[in-house]
């Protein structure tokens, strides 16, 4: 290589490296997106295996009666109040939550571990998750204790002793059907009589969380909504990347067992390895106990414009494991979580900008209205730094056609950067819009990422 050419090439590389470092440095005003290169663990995405595949399910278990239909209907209104997550499950409790583990049918594996299965059921449930307390008589639980969870679907999820806390119950993943099968796996040096297990409550879903109707039934969004794949930008790398950063959130309140849906966005950062930073709304996750129950659903979209259930993306992936709250500001409705498990391959770490959004900007929103497959809405920023419903520093967006709904809460307000990529600028609080609303009500409000970036910038760089 010619000496001058070589020096020029080195200079270009140095400048590129410097730019990359500047974007990753604390206090940087923006950052481009990036494709995920890590692989989620099979245990957290439903690809675990039973330790004893041929074991029988013990008759002993916990069984819950179905809740009154009017209670289920009352819990999930068609138009929840702005600033509230969409409720999709109700809590059921029992007066006899304990299971005597010594009464189960135990079978040893070839390596000496002890395994047993038992059912947790709720009459008529389309989907189900359970709160489980498992502890030794001394209180602490060995890390090598395993729990496997399965329902009517093919997924088998896994949790270990380190996932369970003596301070609060562990909420299982949401499974399909009215019966959750639990396999308990104990190390060779631990006996069933050494443990106490109880199931104080379950969260009951009257409709399937994963097979929600696409134009009728639970999860069906309004008629004005636009499938994400129908957007004119669909098929471009920038837009498809932005959709791959968005996930449906499902979480449960330990106080009453109610389960809820919001939308969130995975954010890029300069850490190595990357941290799983996840942006949503403060009104979705109120405390750490709730954050610990979070599971995210990725790639939940149709592959054809206005497709029915048969066109659901076959790559839909459920990620369990919960999250930790890094930042929460109820007044501004901002929330930054860190997922405890690595998202699946193919997700995108969304770029962002901490520069205040300009009035008149074109805004984009990719979201899960009523828990439906991903939808796309586009609108114009008509006011910044406003107060609405007691919340401050919000950005107002006016919608000409498609709007947002319950379940869309927390979804990212995006703008397009000079290079054509998308940048997150805030998260959805809510507002008066609905399909068919008059022009005066076709607007909603988003939090402002730039207004809290000084508080959270340390999480985006080493």
UniProtKB/Swiss-Prot annotation:
InterPro entries: Peptidase_S1_PA, Peptidase_S1_PA_chymotrypsin. Keywords: Autocatalytic cleavage, Disulfide bond, Hydrolase, Protease, Secreted, Serine protease, Signal, Virulence, Zymogen. It comes from Pseudomonas aeruginosa (strain ATCC 15692 / DSM 22644 / CIP 104116 / JCM 14847 / LMG 12228 / 1C / PRS 101 / PAO1). Its EC number is 3.4.21.50. Disulfide bonds join 224-435, 230-305, 262-284. The keyword tRNA processing does not apply. GO terms for molecular function: serine-type peptidase activity. This is Lysyl endopeptidase. Changing residue 327 to A: No loss of activity.
């Amino acid at each position: 290589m010619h000496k001058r050419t070589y020096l020029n090439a080195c200079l270009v590389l140095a400048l590129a490296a410097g730019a990359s470092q500047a974007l990753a440095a604390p206090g940087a005003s923006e950052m481009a997106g990036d494709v995920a290169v890590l692989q989620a663990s099979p245990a957290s995405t439903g690809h675990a295996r039973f330790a004893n595949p041929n074991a029988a399910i013990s008759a002993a278990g916990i069984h819950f009666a179905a809740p009154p239909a009017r209670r289920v209907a009352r819990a999930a209104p068609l138009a929840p109040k702005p600033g509230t997550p969409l409720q999709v499950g109700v809590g059921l409790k029992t007066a006899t939550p304990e299971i005597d583990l010594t009464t189960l049918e135990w079978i040893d594996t070839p390596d000496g571990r002890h395994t047993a299965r038992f059912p947790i059921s709720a009459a008529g449930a389309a989907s189900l998750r359970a709160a489980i307390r498992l502890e030794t008589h001394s209180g602490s639980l060995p890390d090598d204790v395993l729990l496997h969870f399965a329902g009517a679907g093919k997924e088998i999820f896994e949790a270990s002793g380190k996932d369970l806390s003596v301070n609060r119950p562990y909420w299982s993943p949401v499974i399909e059907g009215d019966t959750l099968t639990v396999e308990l796996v104990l190390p060779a040096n631990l006996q069933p009589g050494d443990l106490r297990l109880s199931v104080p409550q379950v969260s009951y879903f009257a409709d399937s969380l994963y097979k929600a109707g696409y134009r009728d039934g639970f999860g069906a969004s309004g008629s004005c909504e636009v499938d994400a794949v129908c957007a004119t930008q669909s098929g471009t790398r920038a837009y498809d990347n932005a959709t791959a950063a968005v996930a449906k959130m499902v979480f449960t309140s330990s106080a009453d067992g109610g389960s809820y849906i919001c939308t969130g966005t995975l954010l890029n950062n300069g850490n190595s390895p990357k941290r799983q930073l996840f942006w949503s709304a403060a009104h979705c996750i109120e405390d750490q106990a709730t954050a610990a129950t979070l599971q995210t659903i990725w790639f939940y979209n149709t592959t054809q414009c206005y497709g029915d259930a048969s066109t659901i993306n076959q790559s839909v992936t459920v990620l369990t494991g919960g999250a930790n709250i890094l930042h929460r500001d109820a007044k501004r409705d901002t929330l930054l979580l860190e997922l405890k498990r690595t998202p699946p391959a193919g997700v995108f770490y969304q770029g962002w900008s901490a520069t205040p959004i300009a009035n008149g900007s074109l805004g984009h929103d990719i979201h899960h209205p009523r828990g439906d497959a991903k939808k796309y809405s586009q609108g114009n920023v008509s006011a910044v730094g406003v107060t609405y419903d007691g919340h401050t520093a919000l950005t107002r967006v006016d919608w000409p056609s498609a709007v947002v709904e319950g379940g869309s809460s927390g979804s990212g307000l995006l703008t397009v950067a000079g290079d054509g990529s998308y940048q997150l600028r805030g998260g959805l609080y809510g507002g008066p819009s609905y399909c068919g609303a008059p022009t005066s009500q076709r607007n909603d409000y988003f939090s402002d990422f730039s207004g809290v970036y000084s508080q959270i910038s340390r999480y985006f760089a080493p």
